[in-house]
Amino acid sequence: MRKEELRTYIENHESEMIEDLKSLIRIPSEKQAAEPGKPFGAPAAEALAQGIEILEKYGFAVTNYDNYAIAADFNQEEKGLDILAHLDVVPAGEGWQETDPFIPLIKEGKMFGRGTADDKGPAIAAIYAMRAVKELGYPLKKNVRLVLGSDEECGSSCLLYTSPSPRDGLLSRMPSSA
């Protein structure tokens, strides 16, 4: 029953999901020189700001860790599931054949653009999973925390700033690391 309900929910929100992903792909969030308040450069900070906008649009309270990373909690429980994803991308370089790397394109049912698989697409999938659970009213006994970093491609130093001490989550992984 819930599986079918979730499938229907995702199908009904597919166009929103695609637009949210496109909004992230358009940001060339390659690591750049630090600026005041933007430790990994302006594009990385812009990607985090877009992540905040998306999460807040769906009713999640978001903590911004000084533009190193952001985190959204499903509820106020202390321990639970941590989902880690990132909004930075490796430099575009050569080899793109379908589209400009930062202009999203859907062709034959597939989306092309920098970050669709690593890791903006999985980040959007995680946001929509949390949104579906919330909007469908599924009760959770523990918290789910989504942490979106901005420096994974260059060492993940962004995650050092997400909490004064490491959380005791039951599982921490990136959605793209299945």
Positions of the model-derived regions?
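Active-site metal-coordination/substrate-binding segment of hydrolases
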Residues: 80-148
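Gly/Ser-rich oxyanion-binding loop with an adjacent helix/lid
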Residues: 145-159
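N-terminal helical capping/dimerization or prosegment-like subdomains
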Residues: 1-85, 89-93
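Hydrophobic alpha-helical segments, chiefly the membrane-spanning helices
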Residues: 172-178
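Conserved small/polar residues in nucleotide/adenosyl-binding loops
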Residues: 161-166
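Short acidic, glycine/proline-rich loop/turn micro-motifs
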Residues: 34-37, 116, 158
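Glycine/Thr-rich phosphate-binding loops of Rossmann-like dinucleotide-binding domains
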Residues: 91-93, 157, 172
